[in-house]
């Protein structure tokens, strides 16, 4: 019987998690930061924010981009509900575009056709979320062309595709998309039990992602120097979307054998 979401855990994984559990800090510590660095290098992105799960990643992105009632976001109908829910949670409207029959990814030619014909939609599209379904990269060159032409933010829901190649490049995602989201649920290529990540080359986005990950906290270094290390401000409504250190330790260990895990899945 083939399990829906059977994780692959080896002795190294157990060893690294055990080490993390013996540390003084097991919540969000330096292992989380190390995992972010490893993911950034793997996907050739400047910035990474790891979070509690892939759905949290999408919701943080949606809140960062400030979608609202009159906005539309183009996306695929073939995905887990979190992809469209992040749009609805912000009060915006998901507009489903059909998929390519061979790759099951968003069909950019249909995107172009819809935007050409529908001026109402064209004026209100704020973003496009494409899922690299079952590890198959979308036609990112064409999608990037469309995002530049019609001025919308391009988001890669890369939860199925960590380690995939586009034009023979595993770091393709950040070359084309403005923002990339990942999931580390057991059904994905690597797991942290639950977990997710957001990657970008935008420093402005990254600052917002990290703030929203932790209750909307804002830390001004000048004020911290004046008032003390514990001084912080909360400037917008959010919640706790943090990953803990022993999850991050598992993620680092799993990432080291990503290629082996992908080969195992292909069998």
Where are these regions (language model features)?
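Helix C-cap/helix->beta junction micro-motif
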Residues: 90, 149-150, 267
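Phosphate-binding glycine-rich loop
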Residues: 25-72, 86-88, 95-98, 120
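Hydrophobic residues in well-ordered beta-strands that form the structural core
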Residues: 75, 96, 154-156
């Amino acid at each position: 019987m083939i399990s829906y979401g059977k994780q692959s855990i080896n002795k190294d994984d157990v060893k690294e998690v055990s080490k993390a559990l013996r540390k003084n800090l097991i919540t969000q510590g330096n292992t989380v930061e190390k995992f972010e660095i490893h993911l950034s290098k793997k996907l050739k992105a400047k910035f990474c924010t790891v979070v509690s799960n892939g759905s949290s990643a999408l919701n943080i992105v949606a809140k960062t981009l400030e979608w609202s009632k009159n906005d539309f976001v183009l996306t695929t109908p073939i995905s887990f509900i979190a992809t469209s829910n992040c749009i609805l949670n912000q009060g915006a409207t998901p507009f489903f575009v059909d998929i390519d029959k061979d790759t099951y990814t968003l069909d950019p030619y249909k995107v172009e056709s819809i935007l050409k014909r529908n001026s109402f939609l064209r004026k209100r599209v704020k973003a496009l979320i494409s899922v690299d379904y079952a590890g198959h990269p979308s036609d990112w060159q064409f999608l990037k062309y469309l995002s530049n032409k019609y001025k919308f933010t391009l988001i890669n829901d890369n939860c199925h595709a960590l380690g995939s190649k586009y034009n023979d490049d595993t770091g393709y995602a950040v070359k084309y998309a403005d923002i990339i989201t990942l999931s580390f649920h057991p059904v994905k290529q690597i797991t942290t039990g639950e977990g997710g990540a957001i990657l970008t080359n935008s420093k402005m986005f990254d600052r917002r992602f990290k703030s929203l990950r932790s209750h909307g906290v804002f830390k001004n270094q000048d004020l911290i120097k004046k008032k003390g290390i514990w001084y912080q401000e909360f400037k917008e409504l959010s919640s706790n979307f943090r990953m803990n250190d022993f999850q991050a330790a598992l993620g680092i260990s799993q990432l080291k054998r990503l290629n082996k895990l992908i080969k195992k899945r292909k069998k």
